[in-house]
Amino acid sequence: MFEHIPVLLEESVSFLITNPDGIYVDATFGLGGHSKRILEKISNKGFLIAIDRDLEAIELGKRKLEAYKNVKIVHSSFSKVDELLECLGIEKIDGILFDFGVSSLQLDKQERGFSYNKEAFLDMRMDTTSKLTAYDVVNFYSQEDLEKIIREYGEERFARRIAKAIVERRSKKPIETTTELSSLISSLVPRPKDGSHPAQRTFQAIRIEVNGELDEIKIALEKSLRFLRSGGRICAISFHSLEDRIVKEFFKFHSLECVCPKDIPVCRCGKKKELNIITKKPITPSKEEIESNKRSHSAKLRVAEKV
C-alpha cells in the first residue's frame, strides 16, 4: 500500500474551513489525506467534493473515506471545476484546496515513469487516460521546443546542452526509459550545489509539459474564484517557484482595486477588489515536518479570502 503523507495538513485545513456546515473542494484528492482531515473538521451538514485526474490514486484513496457520506469523489482535472460544480447543482462554495505537484504514489510507483531513479517507460502522465507521454515529448519535440520547455519549466541553465544531446541520441535510437534519459543528462550536467539530482529539473520540465500543469493551475484559480462565496477561501500549496509565482500573482492581481496606469488620474478599468490576502508571507513546513517528510521541504501555502 502506497502512502502519501499530506503536506501542511493542519495548517491548510485550519485556514480552509471557515464554516463547518459549508461546501468545500479538495481539488487534488491524491490518496485522500487532506480530504479525510476536512471531513473530520466539517459537520454532517457540510459537504466535500474531491477531484483528481489520477484514477489509481482515487481507487486507493477512497478507502479512507468509506465512513463518510457527505463526500463526492470525481475523476477529472481541477481545471474543469466549474463544470463539475454546475453538474452537481452547486452555485457557491466555502473554500477550495489545491496541493500542486506530483504525489508520492506517482513518484514511487516505478511503472508510472516519473522518477529519474527508477527504470520505467517514459510516461509521466498523471491521468493515464490522456494521450501525450514523456516519450512523445523526448522523442518527437523539436530541439527548439525541448530547449524552451527545459529552460522555462525546469529553470535549467543547461537547457540548450541537454536539448541538443537528446536530439542527437534519439537520431540513433529512441530514448525509451527514465534511466536512459537520466543517465544522458547526468553525463552532461554537473551535480547542483544543493545536492539534487542533475536530471531533476529536466524531469520536472517534461512532467509539467506532459500534464499541462501550469495552464491547469491558472485556469482552475480563475474558475474557482467565480464560485467562492464572500468569506470563502482559496488555499494553495505549491512545491516550486513556477507554481508559487502563479498563485502569488493571481492573489495580488485580484486583491487590487484598480490596475490602470499610474499616469491616468481617473480609474477607467473598473476593476473591483475580489480577494483579501490572508498569508502576507507563505506558510512553510516546520522543521519537524521536514524531518518526518523530506518531500515537504519546498512546500509553500498561500491563502486568500473572497471579499
From Swiss-Prot:
Catalytic function, reaction form: cytidine(1402) in 16S rRNA + S-adenosyl-L-methionine = N(4)-methylcytidine(1402) in 16S rRNA + S-adenosyl-L-homocysteine + H(+)
Top-level EC class: transferase
Keyword Cytoplasm: yes
GO molecular function, one term: rRNA (cytosine-N4-)-methyltransferase activity
Pfam family, one: Methyltransf_5
Cellular component, GO annotation: cytoplasm
Keyword check for Cytoplasm: yes
Record keywords: Cytoplasm, Methyltransferase, rRNA processing, S-adenosyl-L-methionine, Transferase
EC number(s) given by UniProt: 2.1.1.199
Purpose: Specifically methylates the N4 position of cytidine in position 1402 (C1402) of 16S rRNA.
Family label: Belongs to the methyltransferase superfamily. RsmH family.
HAMAP family to which the protein is assigned, alphabetical: 16SrRNA_methyltr_H
Protein name, UniProt field: Ribosomal RNA small subunit methyltransferase H
Gene: rsmH
